[in-house]
Amino acid sequence: MALLNNDTQVSVLVDGLDHPEGIAWGLDGYAYAGGEAGQVYRIDIDRGEMVQFADTGGFVLGMALDAQSNIYVCDGPNKTVFKIAQSGAVSTYSTGTADEPFRGPNYAAFDVKGNLYVCESGDWHGDNGMIYRIKPGGETEVWDRRPTTFPNGLCIGP
């Protein structure tokens, strides 16, 4: 993981991560990232150290943290959003809906009410991507199903 300073200098913040994706900052002062073999890393930027503290067994894509520093991880191959506690305990938070299960959850973001929005990439080069809303506790619904080609990221405004 690196930092670009002044558009000309790159500083390595931490080394040794496996294809980090979905980097997120926690209120606890750590950065978090996932790896392509399901690794979930906690990163101490000040010390330049990381530790793998959880594993989903899939490919960690986007992630978001709640106010309690639980990490919600989009795992493409497992077609699941996992909830990861700071202890490293991994549990299934959502697999989509009964009628429309996840095919490839890609990125997650919280709103101020604690709803987790997840972009579902759909099929490669297809226009069947959509956005799900997962309410606190895990109840999941399709929030937006307008034809979208491979959504890969989202941002929630006030």
Language-model segments: what does each one mean?
Residues 1-158:
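Sequence-structural signature of mature extracellular/luminal beta-sheet repeat domains
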